[in-house]
Amino acid sequence: MTAIFKREVRSSFHGMIGYVLTAFMLAATAIYFVALNLGYGLTDFGYYTLYRTTFVLLLYIPVLTMRSFAEERRTRTDQLLLTSPVSVWEIVLGKFFALCVIFALPCLADAVMILVLAALGATGTATLANLAALLCYYLMGCAAIAIGVFLSSLTENQIIAAVAGVAALLLAYMMPSLRSMFTAGSAVALALFTAIAAVLSVVAGLRTRSFTLGCLTFAGCCVVLTALFLLQSSWLTEAFSAVLSGLCLFTPFEEFVNNSFSISTLVYYLTVTMLFLFFTAQGLEKRRWN
C-alpha cells in the first residue's frame, strides 16, 4: 500500500495537475477569507468561507479523482496491480489516502487562516468552532473523493469519470432543492423502492451467477413493498424522504457550521466514505477473479 500511495502522490505532482488544483482551491478560499473574514471582521470561518466554497468541490474533486483508476485501465497497468501480491483493499486505500493527502494541502492553508483570525482577536470558542468546521469540511471532501474514486474505477476514460463525478456531486449539491419538489406520496415512493429492488436483484443475480436467485430476490422485495404500500403507506413516504436526505452530501456540513455541531455528521461522512470504498474494492475484486 505504501508503494501505491507514494506513486500516486508523486504522479499528481510530477505534472501540473496537483499544483493547479491546490492553487485553485487556495484562490477560492482566499477570496472569501479576505473579502468577508478580514474585510468585515467576521470570525466565523466555517460559514463565511468554508461553506461558501463548497461549490468549488464540484469541480475540484472530479478532476482530482478522474485519473485514479481510469488511467490505470486505459494504459492496462491495472493488470499489474490486480496480479501483484497485494490485496484489493491495499490498492484502493493506497490511492484513496494519496488523494486525501493532496486535498489536505489546501485544508492546511485553511488552518493557517483560522490561526490568523485567532491572532486578530477571535475568541478561543470561535477558533475551536472554526477548527471543528474545518475537520467536518475535510471529511466531507474525503467522502466526495471516495465517490470520485468509485466512478473512476468504472471506466477507462478520464473525461467520462470527471463528467460522472461532476454530475454525481452536482446532484448531491442540488438535492435539498430537488427534495422540496418531491413531496411525493406513497405511490412515487413505491416506484422508487421497486426500482432500487430491481437493481439490487440484478446485482445479486450477477454476483451469484444465478438468474433464479435474482428473480426470487426481486419477487420477495415486491411482496414486502406491496404489503407496506397497502397496510402502512406512511412508512414508505418516510423512508422515501430519508433516502433523499441521505443523498444530500453537503447539507450536513451546512447544518454543522450553523452552530449544530453533531457527531452524527462526522459519522455520516465516514460512513459514505467507507461505503464507496467498499463498492470500489468489490468491483476490483470481481475484475481480479475474472
Predicted feature descriptions by range:
Residues 1-71, 112, 203-213, 218, ...:
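Hydrophobic alpha-helical transmembrane segments
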Residues 13, 85, 154-155, 260:
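Helix-loop interface residues and adjacent transmembrane-helix termini in multi-pass membrane transporters
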Residues 19, 89, 158-159, 264:
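Residues that define the loop-to-transmembrane-helix transition and helix capping
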Residues 25-29, 98-99, 166-170, 222, ...:
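Residue-level recognition of pore/gate-forming positions within transmembrane alpha-helices
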Residues 29-36, 40-56, 98-165, 173-184:
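Secretory targeting signals
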Residues 51-55, 133-140, 186-196, 215-218, ...:
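Alpha-helical transmembrane segments of polytopic membrane proteins
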Residues 68-100:
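Helix-loop-helix units of permease transmembrane domains in multi-pass membrane transporters
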Residues 158-255:
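Transmembrane helix segments
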